[in-house]
Amino acid sequence: GVQVAGPGNCAKRLDVAAAAITMGATVDDMAQFNLGYAPPYSVAIDVLVNAAQVMQNKLSGVAQALTPLEVQALTEQGEDIMLLDVRTPAEFAEVRLKHPKAFALPLGRVRDKAPDLPKDKLYIPFCKLSLRGYEAAKILEGQGFKRVKFMDGGVIHWPFELEYGKG
């Protein structure tokens, strides 16, 4: 099934999802959907197609993520983790995780700072949602880090304590 709510063109998403369900589409099928769009009004890759592509990456192991609850469980188990907040300094100053293992390292500085980071820790980059966290994870993997997973949902979906104001 599918549920659709919110601003934007919900009817289109519902129609596409209903058609996919009716035809028995797999995640791989949906990732290949080529839907019509108008550049001034929508993106080239529909959000449903993008979601299917993200799922493909997760199922194949290309994208390895942890939920905020899994991150918290690792913390409670004493796992040696480093939470990398890869958002901009302005975003960090506005709101940040209140977590002893979280620190700011903006995405644009990850490549330069990676050689200074110990490689024996589990690195968990995150951002507002997930995209920059995923990108930072790929940068670290490209620099030889073996223990890297990004945090799904980022700050927006962190259900634990946050700090606000100047960081």
Kindly give the residue locations of the regions a language model identified.
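C-terminal catalytic lobe of FAD-dependent flavoproteins
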Residues: 1-30
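Rhodanese-like catalytic fold shared by cysteine-dependent sulfurtransferases
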Residues: 28-80, 89-124, 128-167
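Structural scaffold elements adjacent to functional motifs in cytosolic proteins
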Residues: 83-85
